[in-house]
Regions:
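Divalent metal-coordination and catalytic microenvironments
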Residues: 67, 77, 115, 122, ...
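Active-site metal-binding loops of divalent metal-dependent hydrolases
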Residues: 78-80, 116, 142, 192-195, ...
């Protein structure tokens, strides 16, 4: 078993942890910046790669990215629900619709699931992907039981720094994943450390692990940081993977700092994480879709610009995408 697991629960090696549940009511007395009920989004299919070597990364919203490659299509933390909470009628309401409709998604070969929080793990979406595409679900230790409850069958559970070479052939009984897959190309997925916590209820805290993923396609590397506070693990990511082409880094849900600092980075910390991992380019995520904390929906992007300037980083090196917008590698 993992060296960051003890007495039935996972933990962050540096001692960081979320605030205890009994402190959550204090959030009711914080000042919340206003959010709109809805922000218009133009939903459209994502553009396909124009060549076998091109990778297209589309921001669907929050922590959901569609990564299209000729080696197979990948989706991260897919959430298409209207609320990020249990039962479908509780939890923060979505204010930006997904940039790509579920029915417009291309065939998905891999689903990457960073942890079990409702804004990252939507069982209805996972169930729909399982039914439609029979993809392989790659997650962290302790999450398989939850996924099986949604009918998911092809599950790979990884510990931090564990690598899974990804076979592109469908398992027996599964339908073909993608007719445009290039034979012989391979995707490698490595679980990476994050500083966070897990819980679906008040009674299962840290029973399942959290993390991020490094996606290696040929010699190109895309880092999906998952949900994380700032910590020394980012330097370790950069040490283990010295040629990251693109990093997807959370920049939102960070106020108030007394409650969020250990588990969510603010934009200044996100810029430092970008520097630590040594990415050629980073794209911000985890903002402007669900009202999780007290800052306004647009403040993370504005603060990212200020932090980028203060650090002397070129504007193009760490950007954000509009919901539904794509970047090409």
């Amino acid at each position: 078993m993992s060296d960051h697991f003890d007495n039935g629960r996972f933990f962050n090696p540096n001692g960081a942890d979320a605030q205890p549940f009994w402190k959550a009511p204090r959030m009711l007395f914080e000042h919340y910046a206003p959010w709109p009920a809805q922000v218009p989004v133009v939903q459209r299919p994502s553009p396909p790669p124009t060549s076998s070597d091109e990778i297209v990364v589309t921001f669907i919203g929050h922590a959901t990215f569609l990564i299209q490659t000729s080696a197979g299509n990948i989706i991260t933390d897919p959430v298409f629900a209207q609320r990020a909470g249990p039962f479908g009628w509780t939890g923060p309401r979505r204010v930006r619709q997904p940039g790509v409709r579920f029915d417009d998604l291309p065939p998905i070969a891999y689903v990457l699931l960073s942890h079990n929080h409702y804004d990252h793990c939507d069982l209805e979406t996972l169930r729909a992907l399982q039914h439609r595409d029979h993809p392989r679900f790659v997650t962290l230790q302790g999450n398989a039981t939850l996924l099986r409850s949604a009918g998911v069958t092809r599950i790979a559970e990884l510990d931090w720094w564990q690598r899974m070479p990804a076979e592109m052939s469908a398992m027996p009984g599964a339908q073909t994943l993608d007719p445009v897959v290039t034979p012989g190309r391979e995707i490698e997925i490595t679980a990476t450390q994050a500083q966070h916590f897990s819980a679906r209820t008040p009674f299962d805290r840290n029973r399942a692990l959290w993390g991020g993923f490094m996606i290696t396609i040929d010699e190109r590397q895309i880092y999906f940081a998952g949900d994380s506070g700032y910590g020394p693990h980012f330097l370790e990511v950069g040490r283990r993977f010295p040629r990251i082409d693109l990093a997807l880094i959370p920049i939102g849900a960070y106020e108030p700092r007394w409650f969020m600092k250990d588990i969510h980075m603010n934009p200044e910390e996100a810029v430092q994480a970008h520097i630590d991992v040594g990415a050629r380019r980073s794209i911000g995520m985890h903002f402007g879709t669900f009202r999780l904390t007290t800052e306004g929906p647009n403040e993370p992007v504005a603060a990212l610009g200020r932090a980028r300037s203060a650090a002397g980083i070129d504007d193009a090196a760490f950007t954000t995408l509009d919901v539904g917008e794509s970047a090409r590698l």
